């Protein structure tokens, strides 16, 4: 299972893994790296209309280097930086040591 669609913070990634995702598409976070080739632009693949071509060009503001985005350190609590460290911390807080264990987390779904 590959989770895609609006994955912009470490919280989104953590929830996708807990729901069983094997991988997570993170176009927006990677596009926010200073060294990203698109310089803040990326091609979002959301379907705008069923009969029209998929996707749209999306602009995001650079927030740090690729290493900072993936590995930290985080300078704020937005969840946009240190994605792997935040996932590891969330797994530890939930009592899981591996991604495979986290993928089997018991979930509670509440209606609103």
Predicted regions located by residue number:
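Alpha/beta catalytic cores of nucleotide-metabolism and tRNA/nucleoside-modifying enzymes
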Residues: 1-3, 8-112
């Amino acid at each position: 299972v590959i989770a895609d669609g609006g994955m912009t913070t470490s919280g989104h990634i953590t929830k996708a893994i807990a729901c069983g995702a094997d991988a997570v598409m993170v176009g927006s976070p990677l596009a926010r790296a200073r060294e990203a080739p698109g310089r803040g632009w990326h091609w979002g693949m959301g379907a705008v209309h069923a009969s029209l071509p998929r996707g749209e060009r999306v602009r995001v503001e650079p927030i740090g280097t690729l290493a900072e985005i993936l590995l930290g350190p985080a300078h704020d609590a937005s969840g946009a930086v240190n994605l792997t460290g935040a996932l590891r911390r969330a797994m530890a807080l939930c009592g899981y040591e591996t991604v495979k264990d986290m993928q089997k987390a018991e979930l509670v779904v509440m209606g609103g």
